[in-house]
Amino acid sequence: SAASDVYKRQEESRSCINIWDEVNHVQTEFLEPGFTVSEEEFKGFEKHFTELVKKADVVAMSGSVPKGLDGTAYQRLVRICKEAGKKVILDTSGKLLEMGIEAKPTMIKPNIDEIRMLTGKSCDNFQDMVDAAKQIHADGVEIVAVSLGGDGSFVVCDDGIFRARVPKIDAVNTVGCGDSMIAG
């Protein structure tokens, strides 16, 4: 079973609402901005997180971080996990991903655009994508699971390169697909 522990704050957590218009086949997202976290508050969270990590086997971190935090937020949390000898999965994007992989998470789940950003490679074909993922793996990320959207995914790890193809379906909504992938 998965344990949970809440780090309480005065502010309410944000809501993210996704609406699917079945008539026009249009998706609309409402993403509340959320609260701002100061460096001092984040240090308090890091202290709490350090204790929590001791109880975990694997830690998954995904998405964005609150306003007020810079690109090092996940990097710092990944380091805490690694220092505790825990496996850590990082599923984020942009500067958070770029800085986060410097701490060598156990696994990342980038998409093609993120692989391009991390390696500077064009990734115009499958072999280029694999080579880019191999570069990240060689730099210390144990498992690089690359999402290819409707074309499935592939994984680069010490045991080799593995490709997963998915059946063609009419996707109604892709919200949560990446989260589901790292959960599996």
Model-predicted segments: where are they?
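Short, small-residue-biased leader/transition segments that mark boundaries at the very start
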Residues: 2-7
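Short beta-strand segments
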Residues: 8-9, 18-20, 31, 61-62, ...
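Gly/Ser-rich phosphate-binding catalytic loop and adjacent alpha/beta segment
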Residues: 8-15, 38
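Short glycine-rich anion-binding loops that position phosphate/pyrophosphate groups of nucleotides
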Residues: 12, 33-35, 64-67, 114, ...
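Conserved phosphate-binding/catalytic loop of the ribokinase/pfkB sugar-kinase fold
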Residues: 19-54
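A short, aliphatic-rich alpha-helical micro-motif
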Residues: 53, 101-102, 138
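Conserved beta-alpha-beta core of the PfkB/ribokinase-like small-molecule kinase fold
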Residues: 58-129
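Conserved phosphate-binding/catalytic region of the ribokinase-like
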Residues: 79-83, 98, 126-184
